[in-house]
């Protein structure tokens, strides 16, 4: 990285490299903080990797995402990047298969039913593989950290911890997998009570309204597990409006490294935010560059998982010192290519200048 993080020096330009055309129907809204971060980083990576990248915005509407994906296929790019949020991947991949366009799954993986629908004999034609976040691990870390914070604060005098969970849209794998991680924590600790679990379509306003109702009904709640930062910010506002004190008598965790959430982590209102998975798209583009330059004809079937990193109060200041502003966009993403990247697909390795993450235990 230039200057700001001191991680990745600029590499010499790759001479004679053919430009690629890559397209993606993004499942998110243009206003989603996570997808804003992810798309900005993808555009930066595309510049470094000689890729012409087209991103169309699905606005969290399944029909729109599929229609956009098929339209992008009609433009005949060299590759399609496909996310399976809202179960949209199969029709887009099938459209790409009909035109012999390879696809790579990114951000949200196929389900078993999807694989059965796409399977043609022993393999899925023109599917290179997948690169997805380890959402279940993230959900576990969030759950354990939340319980630990409550116990350390002494807000569970009878030894029991009362939680509620604000999950994301159940039609997205990220929401389901993060909840799966939380449920692992609940099964392992019989002293934790999950009093309520609701799902919202990744909406801060909806998280605010649902949390307001839940805390009015169950004021004994001392922890709110939230599937992402936007939901945590909405839930925190609801708690504050009811006279609760986030970080003192009620605790919150989130995910995405949203700047506003990192403010809350820094001042103690949020226990932590996991993140770094906005880099998935950049890593995916590097994989496509490698796939093209190796002249592979058929799919490799590779499945890679990206481990998210913890941002807590001890680390957030250092993070902002080294990675603030457009620092992520100024990485040299040619370093993400196979053979150049020594860090694999772990965000933590990119954060080497930060203090070590303090996890609740070593099972994360």
Name each model feature, range by range.
Residues 94-137, 261-262:
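Flexible loop/hinge segments that line or gate small-molecule binding clefts
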Residues 47-58, 165, 187-204:
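Short beta-strand elements in bilobed, periplasmic/extracellular small-molecule ligand-binding domains
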Residues 166, 170, 283-364:
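Hinge/cleft segment of the Venus flytrap/periplasmic-binding protein
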Residues 33-48, 138-145, 173-192, 210, ...:
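Short, solvent-exposed amphipathic alpha-helices that sit
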Residues 1-15:
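N-terminal export signals
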């Amino acid at each position: 990285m230039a200057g700001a993080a001191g991680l990745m020096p600029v590499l010499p330009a790759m001479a004679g490299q053919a430009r690629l055309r890559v397209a993606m129907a993004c499942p998110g809204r243009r206003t989603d903080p996570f997808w804003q971060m992810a798309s900005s980083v993808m555009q930066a990576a595309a510049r470094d990797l000689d890729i012409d990248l087209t991103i169309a915005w699905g606005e969290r509407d399944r029909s729109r995402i599929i229609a956009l994906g098929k339209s992008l296929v009609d433009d005949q790019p060299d590759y399609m990047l496909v996310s399976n949020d809202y179960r949209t991947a199969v029709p887009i991949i099938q459209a790409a298969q009909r035109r012999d366009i390879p696809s790579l799954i990114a951000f949200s993986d196929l389900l078993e039913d999807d694989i059965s629908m796409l399977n043609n004999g022993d393999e899925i034609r023109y599917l290179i593989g997948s690169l997805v976040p380890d959402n279940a691990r993230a959900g576990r870390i969030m759950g354990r950290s939340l319980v630990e914070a409550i116990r350390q604060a002494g807000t569970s005098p009878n030894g029991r911890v009362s939680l509620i969970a604000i999950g994301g849209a159940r039609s997205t794998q990220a929401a389901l997998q993060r909840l799966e991680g939380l449920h692992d924590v609940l099964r392992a600790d019989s002293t934790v009570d999950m009093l309520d679990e609701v799902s919202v379509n990744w909406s801060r306003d909806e998280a605010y309204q649902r949390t307001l109702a839940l805390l009015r009904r169950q004021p004994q709640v001392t922890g709110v597990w939230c599937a992402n930062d936007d939901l945590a910010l909405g839930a925190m506002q609801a708690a504050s409006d009811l006279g609760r004190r986030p970080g003192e008598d009620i605790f919150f965790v989130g995910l995405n490294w949203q700047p506003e959430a990192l403010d809350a982590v820094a001042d103690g209102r949020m226990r932590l935010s996991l993140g770094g998975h906005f880099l998935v798209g950049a890593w995916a583009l590097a994989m496509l560059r490698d796939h093209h330059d190796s002249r592979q004809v058929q799919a490799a079937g590779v499945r890679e998982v990206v481990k998210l990193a913890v941002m807590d109060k001890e680390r957030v200041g250092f993070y902002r010192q080294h990675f603030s502003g457009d620092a992520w966009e100024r990485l040299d993403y040619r370093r993400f290519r196979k053979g150049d990247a020594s860090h694999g697909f772990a965000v933590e390795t990119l954060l080497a200048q930060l203090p070590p993450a303090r996890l609740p235990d070593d099972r994360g």
